[in-house]
């Protein structure tokens, strides 16, 4: 399946919440009706969504937030289910530990898509080694940095400036002057922001 490249606002409207696909710092709430489905007539009044439909929508929402396609998402779930602990929480932790997401959380990219592009274009290093696989799992203590030749890119400078104003997650430590950050630890569920009900995804795959 090809990656979606259409209007990002349409995806947020479809899920009824801002997925922050355009910017982590600027909400779409003032720009479009998030409570109205995309299309000429929007949401059909009176239509009731089944339990399966609700579970499926939640899975689609999380896939879109993290920019992961179906086959890869299934692999993440299988790995989460294999590990000890809460499957839903572990699933989110695996997604949050992706290199493209960590680059985004550290403020080097204004969106996950932009962060993914930085990784793919070899603008990022992990522990001093160039990394170009967005799905690479970052471990506690790993140092993620922007390569010297990419530090002057306006989009990176602007994204980092906005991230500093908005505040960084507690599980990363960023040195903005050096364009590098440390992945301090895998985030706990309470530290993962976003309107996500991962238990619905567990229920879906448990059918």
From Swiss-Prot:
Alphabetized PROSITE patterns for the sequence: RIBOSOMAL_S4 (PS00632), S4 (PS50889)
GO cellular component, one term: small ribosomal subunit
Taxonomy, superkingdom: Bacteria
A Pfam short name: S4
UniProt keyword annotations, A-Z: Ribonucleoprotein, Ribosomal protein, RNA-binding, rRNA-binding
Annotated function: One of the primary rRNA binding proteins, it binds directly to 16S rRNA where it nucleates assembly of the body of the 30S subunit.
PANTHER family: 30S 40S RIBOSOMAL PROTEIN, SMALL RIBOSOMAL SUBUNIT PROTEIN US4M
Family to which this protein belongs: Belongs to the universal ribosomal protein uS4 family.
Subunit structure, as described in the record: Part of the 30S ribosomal subunit. Contacts protein S5. The interaction surface between S4 and S5 is involved in control of translational fidelity.
Protein's name in the database: Small ribosomal subunit protein uS4
Organism: Burkholderia pseudomallei (strain 1106a)
Lineage: Bacteria, Pseudomonadati, Pseudomonadota, Betaproteobacteria, Burkholderiales
